[in-house]
Amino acid sequence: MTADPQTTAVIKKVATNGIRVICEHIPTVRSVAAGVWCCTGSVAEPPALNGISHLIEHMFFKGTERRTAAEIAAEIDGVGGALDAFTEKENISFFAHVLYEHLPLALDLLSDILLKATFPREEFVKEKNVVAEEIRLYEDSPDEKIHDLVMGVLRPGEAIGMPVLGSFETLKAIGRDDALRYRNEIFTADRIVIAAAGYVDPEEFIAMVEDYFAAVPGPVGATSRKAAAPPISQPACVKDTEQTHLCVAVPAIPFGHPDRYVLAALTTVLGGNASSRLFQKVREDRGLAYAVYAYGRGFHDSGALVAYAGTSPATALETRDIVLEQFADLAAHKIGADELKRTRDFLKGTLMLSLESTAARMGRNARHEIYMGRHVSLEETLAGVDAVTADDVLRVAGEIFSNQPAVVAIGPNADAVVGA
């Protein structure tokens, strides 16, 4: 059998307790990636407890009623697997990657940390210190921090702009009881998607999920988290850095919008690869930056297109102006036939290459369920990319670049970059 991704099948079933189960059987591999996704992230947090989702993610691995933290690590290491987690604006996910014969162990571990994590008091104090160091690392990494900053400026006073890590102040305010209470509130069956991709029988996987995750509770009483608005982000952060880091962003479209393939093409043309306009004009033609790129972010009800560059303070204004010029040019002129073909082929090629990873497939399937409520096949995606026209790109560019761009900067002359 060839390794054609189109020969695989994606099965969805709703478990008895309401958990959505997504499974993709891939006959050409011998591993399985399985993930538990909670459709709640930092965007749902009370502003005073910003960062609590990320802290809970850490605490899941610090011991359960059956296993110590060391035993959790030893069991997954003992089969050559991987166990990890991440927190985003709208999701929390923890996942395992193992050989197919060890899938029962992976699900046992995932269900154990979800249902039986104890959040030991001494570990809770220690882990808050670990997260504080993570925040310090983040504060010392302007090329990372600026991407949260730009969302806060683009959506002022809205939760989507809150950092996933929280702040020193909010981290200090989070108590163990807060974390346990919030964990119990958000990790309910109606918010959970469990996905797997790899050498796994869908019916067997669904049966195992029914068994291992049967105790996941149903929804609890809804709690309003809109009482307080997060603080307004400031667009300029003056800091003694070697470079000035800048982002220019505009509001875009939600994850599942019909124009999502058009936006992907527009973003690619702008700054998605080494042949993109920003890379060529900023780096290759003028040598102004090493890192320069653009990306799109799609959420449930909003999105953003963001361009980033890190450059010398002396050339930050010039770099910013090039970005704005490219926004204007794409809104006013059609891209050429060769540029369109290259962009389509790039999007299709990078997608096909990513599908060689079971973890990437698992995540793709989970996100489609979370944001669109259905599976989006490879054939549908490829057809969507092929259907993008130069007129489409011009139309979407005109729509989103007509918005006032948010300009943010971190560096010695950040005020000038933002205000000039």
Name each model feature, range by range.
Residues 1-31:
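N- or domain-start disorder-to-order transition segments that initiate the globular core
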Residues 9, 14, 25, 69-224, ...:
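Charge-rich, well-structured scaffold segments of protease-associated domains
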Residues 34, 192, 243-246, 303-305:
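Small-molecule pocket liners
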Residues 45, 49, 103, 107, ...:
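Short, charged, low-complexity patches
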